[in-house]
Amino acid sequence: MGFYMLLTVALLLTSLMNVEATPVDQAERSALEKSGLGNRIQPRYDNCGDAEQTATSQSAWTKKPMMKNVKLPAIMWSQIAFKIKAKTKTKY
């Protein structure tokens, strides 16, 4: 039982050591938010529909992630690559 606990702790520690994230100071984060640097989502039906739909399409913003230099495990990269390949595959 003690061996498995030690093995679990060792695996958790090694997985935590592989994650590297560069912190962003609060001043830089607030400057990015105030400057409006984000990705605007452009719906295809921007000029169609009722006023409520237009109002929600005008406020559709996504923020860029603040973590830099994040290392993902290899299995996550393969899942991401699989999803991208599935989206770009064309049907004939």
From Swiss-Prot:
Alphabetical UniProt keywords: Neurotoxin, Secreted, Signal, Toxin
Tissue and organ expression note: Expressed by the venom duct.
UniProt propeptide residues: 22-39
Record GO terms (molecular function): toxin activity
Residues making up the signal peptide according to the UniProt record: 1-21
Organism: Gemmula speciosa (Splendid gem-turris)
Protein name, UniProt field: Turripeptide UID-02
Subcellular location per the Swiss-Prot or TrEMBL entry: Secreted
Note: The mature peptide contains only 1 cysteine.
Superkingdom: Eukaryota
A Gene Ontology cellular-component term: extracellular region
